[in-house]
Amino acid sequence: MNALQRDLKKLVPLVESLGAEKAAADPHRQRFHLQPPVGWLNDPNGLCVYGGQYHAFFQYGPFDVNGGVKHWGHAVSTDLLHWEQLPVMLYPDEPFDCHGAYSGSALVEDGTMYLYYTGNVKHPGNFDYIKEGRGHNVCLAVSKDGVTLDSKQCLLTNRDYPAGLTCHVRDPKVFAYEGRYYMVLGARTLEDKGEVLVLESTDKLRWTHINTLTTPEPFGYMWECPDLFCLDGQWYLAVSPQGIDCQNVYGCGWFAIHGDWRRDCTLSEFHELDAGFDYYAPQSFVDGNGRRIQIGWMGMPDADYGNAPTVAYGWQHCFTVPRVLTTGPDGTLLQNPVPELDAQRSAAALHAASGEEVFLAPRFDLTAAPAGDFCLTVAQGVQLVYTEQDCTCTLRFTDPALADGRTVRRARLAAPCRSLRVVGDNSSLEIFLNGGATVFSTRYYPAPGDVSVKLTGAACELCNL
């Protein structure tokens, strides 16, 4: 242990203990979403199963509610809904990660947890920090108990990446496949084109670039947080592209891969994962039941809206409810809350007729089977309006007090809406349409106490969570 890590190990728990009471007093503190003890949270990292528990790491700024230097926060759960915070796993305490232990992934093998992450280094000087002045290193931390580190090392630096790239190469996702190990890295070229590098290894340490995944025409200048996975025999690439034309500052979605991603392949058209205000940098993993589970950051970088109500209590952001990924008949990715959420539903369901306003705790689960136009209103200031004629769904804040700058988001459904599910927590709404084919995620900030819910155009069932 070096001196910096020794001191950070003392300082972070102190900061957390000093801010814990204030954060806990926030009425907008979430009940079943992973959130930081204090400070800032963004990307999910290192999602895995280890020792009979789910492990989730997260980009964590304990010293700054608006970001700051990034650590890897750490939490465990047995049901994906109730999380126990553990001590920070990765500190920015080495020359190769001194400006932040940035995003990455976990590989669990033979009782050992391998954490691959981006070591961020910003060199002093008059640099643009895009084409020069920054180091994005692929680093490896190893743990034999899932809690403490046995080693950290730098595996790759910018000199090891292919020619023609900027300094921005990051977010390693590592997995085993057909007797070898593979890594995908998000990258930005010198021509400002986003792409994903595919690397191969036989020993988890030495890596060789074997392919690059991209589109024929530029699609954004940077592809962040790549995730490469197979469902029902079809391979998918999920990325968070920056610089595309979309409703949010940055996009988030998936391509279907046609061909062998290790050699020669093409990408399908891009499909948005979430049409809401707050969804970015999702990652997925396979659990012990063979389910592919995806978790996203319920936030958005560089957005012109915020979370001032929680910032006032010394914390900001959370993860989404974990979602099981499946495929539809046409290969479309479907997202639905993990079934563990069903066990949290109250035994007594409330049945509301069309147009009937009900009041209940903000932690609720609503289901409905609409057959035409409908309008859902939550807390008398958040509306979801569906128009059957053009299969368009609009999420709109009509009360600025709930929004902290959020306004309107829209999505066109591929088919008429015949199922609606809304999962509410103390300061979030996650909306699943047509069995998870279209999803909206947003934070919102209702007054303390019960919230009103009214669905016009269909009857609905509501349960407390």
Which ranges hold each PLM region?
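Beta-rich carbohydrate-recognition and catalytic domains
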Residues: 1-171, 176-219, 230-275, 298-347, ...
